[in-house]
């Protein structure tokens, strides 16, 4: 079945107002105070982001933080309201929430996992079926799953181009959404819904959310060990 709703976006359809959240003075002050300080305004912001990350478009761009703040402190101050931090060596493509703060202004491209899924549904159903049986723990670069009506797509380390079927390559090369990140920006995304085509040099924090896809039956045993091993 096609994956419908806001998670199946196309880059040309989105305007910046749909994914960019300018931070206000109180939110900035709480982040600048560090991850141990009280953060009621950040908790309210996280409450806005959670549904978008879990079953919406799958990402938000936070803008307005000073670029000279320590990246690790910024990410922890935000992340503690969105989930439980995974070990630093955990696989950043297998988590419920990934926070990225580029080391310098950067351009990157986001892809909707649901849109890739739907493109394969139209053009190559046998391939899509095989990706539902794929095992990320065995090195498969792309895998899909639906459990309890909840969709998840996994895109791990790159596979050799020669090994990628043409229909999948075409879907992965779709325009997507090109983002221009400024100094201080933080990208918050759900890697099970949104894939990075090219990841810039960036500080990151991977999180497990309370409503997690990491425990989906077909992925949980092997992938939890993979996340722990990095």
What are these regions (language model features)?
Residues 43-48:
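Short alpha-helical segments and helix-capping/turn motifs at coil-helix boundaries
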Residues 74-79, 168:
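Short amphipathic C-terminal alpha-helix that caps PH/PH-like domains
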Residues 49-54:
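Short, flexible, solvent-exposed loop/turn segments with mixed acidic/basic and small polar residues
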Residues 1-42, 55-60, 64-67, 82-230:
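Active-site environment of non-heme Fe oxygenases that use a 2-His-1-carboxylate facial triad
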């Amino acid at each position: 079945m096609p994956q419908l709703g806001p998670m199946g976006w196309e880059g040309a359809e989105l305007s910046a107002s749909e994914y960019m959240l300018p931070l206000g003075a109180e939110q900035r002050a709480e982040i600048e105070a560090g991850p141990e300080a009280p953060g009621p305004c950040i908790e309210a912001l996280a409450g806005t982001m959670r549904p978008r990350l879990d079953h919406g478009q799958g990402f938000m761009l936070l803008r307005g933080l000073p670029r000279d703040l320590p990246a690790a402190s910024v990410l922890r101050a935000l992340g503690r309201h969105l989930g439980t931090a995974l070990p630093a060596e955990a696989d950043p493509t297998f988590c419920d929430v990934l926070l990225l703060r580029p080391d310098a202004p950067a351009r990157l491209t986001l892809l909707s996992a649901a849109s890739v899924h739907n493109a394969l549904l139209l053009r190559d159903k046998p391939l899509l079926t095989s990706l539902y049986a794929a095992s990320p723990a065995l090195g498969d670069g792309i895998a899909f799953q639906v459990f309890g009506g909840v969709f998840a797509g996994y895109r791990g380390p790159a596979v050799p181009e020669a090994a990628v079927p043409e229909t999948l390559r075409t879907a992965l090369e779709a325009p997507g959404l090109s983002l221009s990140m400024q100094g201080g920006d933080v990208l918050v995304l759900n890697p099970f819904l949104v894939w990075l085509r090219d990841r810039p040099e960036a500080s990151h924090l991977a999180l497990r959310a309370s409503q997690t896809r990491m425990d989906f039956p077909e992925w949980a045993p092997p992938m939890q060990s993979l996340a722990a091993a990095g």
